[in-house]
UniProtKB/Swiss-Prot annotation:
GO terms for cellular component: cytosol; intermediate filament. In the hair cortex, hair keratin intermediate filaments are embedded in an interfilamentous matrix, consisting of hair keratin-associated proteins (KRTAP), which are essential for the formation of a rigid and resistant hair shaft through their extensive disulfide bond cross-linking with abundant cysteine residues of hair keratins. The matrix proteins include the high-sulfur and high-glycine-tyrosine keratins. InterPro entries: KRTAP_type8/19/20/21/22 (IPR021743). The keyword Translocase does not apply. The gene is KRTAP21-2. Pfam families: KRTAP. Interacts with hair keratins. This is Keratin-associated protein 21-2. It comes from the Eukaryota.
Amino acid sequence: MCCNYYRNCCGGCGYGSGWSSGCGYGCGYGCGYGSGCRYGSGYGTGCGYGCGYGSGCGYGCGYSSSCCGYRPLCYRRCYSSCY
């Protein structure tokens, strides 16, 4: 689960789950402020936006629900540093 700095949390990725839900791109920044995650997780091998570019999961991981819905390994990798 990831939270943004507004402490909005969710357990997956999705195109529409950005700043308002704490997933996706917003999570990259939110992890450092409200959820106890490391700031760097947003762009490394952590959660949200960073997953699409830095974790080897593939671009779609940061935006498509299919990443988290159908690729559990990718899902865990995206969010493994967000607890």
